[in-house]
């Protein structure tokens, strides 16, 4: 629920990365930070033979408008999820498994699925949630919706009763995951938020 004001980056890049690719990567980071009004306060870059793709570590810092202290919940609460499960994972699969997917689906279908990756920030819904006084928030990243539900239940110290049919998931995600034999409920789900 904090307002991010700055980040520090640590990049580890492979020896084979071209300067043009590094410039493109940094331009993307800079554009995203400008769009979100976040300052890049510093960082570190190193070249390593131990990585094959760029590894980016981000440390964010910010502030809370007011201190909020909650005790463990004494009553039942509803869990609300923003956006859709597995959107980030779907975008990754579209990139890494493009040849296989192009043999099965039309370019129109794949382009439609790729458009969802443009909405991976949870900043707006997190700000609304804080203003609304939500009890807890958890982003759906590693481990997908299943991992996030487990972590949320541990965070607030209660068990959960979840109806899988009510978890929002795009049809494109379902079909792509089915084609590749991937469980969409365990797929990386950046861009969605549990509240």
Each model region followed by its residue ranges:
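Helix-biased detector of long, well-ordered alpha-helical tracts
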Residues: 2-194
């Amino acid at each position: 629920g904090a307002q991010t004001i700055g980040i520090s980056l640590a990049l580890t890049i492979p020896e084979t990365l071209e300067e043009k690719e590094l410039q493109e990567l940094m331009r993307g980071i800079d554009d995203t930070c400008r769009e979100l009004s976040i300052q890049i306060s510093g960082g570190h870059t190193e070249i390593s033979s131990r990585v094959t793709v760029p590894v980016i570590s981000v440390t964010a810092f910010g502030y809370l408008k007011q201190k909020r202290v909650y005790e463990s919940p004494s009553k039942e609460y509803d869990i609300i999820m923003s956006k859709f499960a597995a959107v980030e994972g779907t975008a990754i699969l579209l990139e890494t498994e493009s040849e296989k997917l192009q043999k099965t689906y039309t370019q129109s279908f794949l382009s439609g699925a790729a458009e969802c990756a443009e909405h991976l920030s949870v900043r707006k819904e997190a700000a609304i949630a804080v203003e609304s006084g939500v009890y807890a928030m958890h982003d759906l990243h590693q481990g997908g919706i299943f991992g996030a539900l487990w972590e949320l239940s541990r965070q607030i110290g209660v068990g959960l009763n979840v109806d899988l049919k009510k978890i929002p998931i795009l049809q494109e995600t379902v079909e792509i995951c089915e084609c590749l034999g991937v469980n969409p409920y365990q797929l990386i789900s950046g861009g969605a938020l549990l509240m």
